[in-house]
């Protein structure tokens, strides 16, 4: 496909599949590879071809369409970002200039990377009747009248992988949150010796029995090189099994996120590891949340916002910006990432009074 979304294809099929109010709501979801002709591709962030998930729905009323799009945004995307990716974001709506083409409202989740730039992690769109009108998506109501549907769409892509790398990674490589990690614990033999390898297998069996996703590295190649390889891959916990500690029934457990080490009895590794994995998950989220708060500056005007955007995010009254202010921000490659209520909640639309905006440089 040449289009970054399947809206045109799905719109045509919705018009064929929907005949009656009994066919509503129609809820469609797909995973597919899409192509977008990027002039300056960036790995994981803006690649010419990428895997993404997109959903499209049709409803009998605006309220139903809006409620479903909002539910996806808060209960699916935001839940996944916070509780799996350990990625705090600012939830809000896009200003008119940044909305998805044809949408009457676009919800977004904006994350901050370690360099202070914003990354749009996921979006959900209220399309009103605009797409239904363009593709003749009608249904017959209970009263026998032909009525236009209300539609929504929402999507996320492998851009989240880029967000994961830039949000949590460090100079040693990836740092993967435990709930996401395909391998949560790697058990490494310090030396390739039968007794050590047997102990590694025993530790792995205990971890598997405790529901931990585990991999064993049986000591082929230098120990230092293998440790470095697993650090690059971001495995949350490393259990080192060496002949010296093994004589006393001990192993060393190392956290990837902090590098903290603890020596444990071999038989106590499984319960301790399970506890540590949950601790790491929480610590990674809270650490990222603290960095986001620390790098978000409340400012009074656009010049201050531009200055703050050199190192992080700026928050200011939306009334101070408007279309003219957006143009002024863009001169310095700063954009309005989202609009929020003053308490940080997501507004229904951009006409609400007393809104604030989050501005930043972005990927």
Model feature map: region roles:
Residues 1-363:
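NTP/phosphate- and nucleic-acid-binding module
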């Amino acid at each position: 496909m040449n289009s970054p979304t399947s809206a045109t294809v799905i719109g045509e099929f919705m018009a064929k599949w929907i005949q009656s109010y009994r066919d509503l709501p129609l809820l469609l979801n797909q995973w597919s590879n899409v192509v977008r002709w990027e002039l300056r591709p960036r790995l994981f962030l803006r690649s010419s071809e990428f895997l993404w998930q997109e959903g499209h729905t049709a409803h009998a009323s605006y309220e139903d369409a809006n409620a479903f799009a909002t539910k996806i945004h808060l209960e699916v995307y935001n839940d996944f970002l916070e509780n799996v990716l350990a990625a705090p974001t600012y939830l809000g709506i896009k200003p008119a200039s940044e909305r998805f083409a044809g949408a009457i409202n676009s919800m977004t989740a904006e994350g901050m990377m370690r360099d202070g730039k914003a990354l749009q992690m996921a979006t959900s769109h209220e399309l009103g009747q605009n797409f239904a009108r363009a593709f003749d998506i009608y249904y017959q109501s209970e009263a026998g009248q032909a009525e236009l549907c209300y539609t929504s769409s929402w999507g996320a892509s492998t851009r989240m992988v880029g967000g994961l790398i830039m949000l949590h990674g460090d100079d040693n490589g990836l740092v993967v949150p435990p709930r996401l990690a395909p391998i949560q614990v790697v058990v490494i033999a310090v030396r390739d010796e039968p007794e050590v390898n047997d102990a590694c297998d025993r530790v792995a069996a205990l971890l598997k029995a405790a529901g931990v996703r585990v991999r064993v590295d049986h000591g082929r190649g230098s120990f230092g090189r293998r440790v470095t390889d697993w650090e690059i891959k971001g495995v949350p916990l490393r259990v080192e099994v060496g002949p010296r500690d093994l004589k006393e029934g001990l192993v060393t457990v190392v956290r990837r996120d902090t590098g903290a080490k603890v020596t444990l009895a071999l038989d106590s590794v499984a319960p301790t590891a399970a506890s540590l994995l949950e601790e790491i998950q929480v610590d990674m989220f809270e650490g990222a949340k603290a960095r986001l708060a620390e790098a978000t500056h409340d400012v009074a005007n656009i010049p201050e916002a531009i200055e703050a955007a050199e190192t992080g995010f700026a928050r200011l009254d939306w009334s101070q910006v408007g279309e003219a202010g957006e143009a002024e921000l863009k001169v310095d490659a700063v954009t309005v990432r989202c609009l929020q209520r003053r308490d940080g909640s997501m507004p229904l639309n951009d006409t609400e009074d007393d809104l604030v905006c989050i501005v930043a440089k972005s990927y």
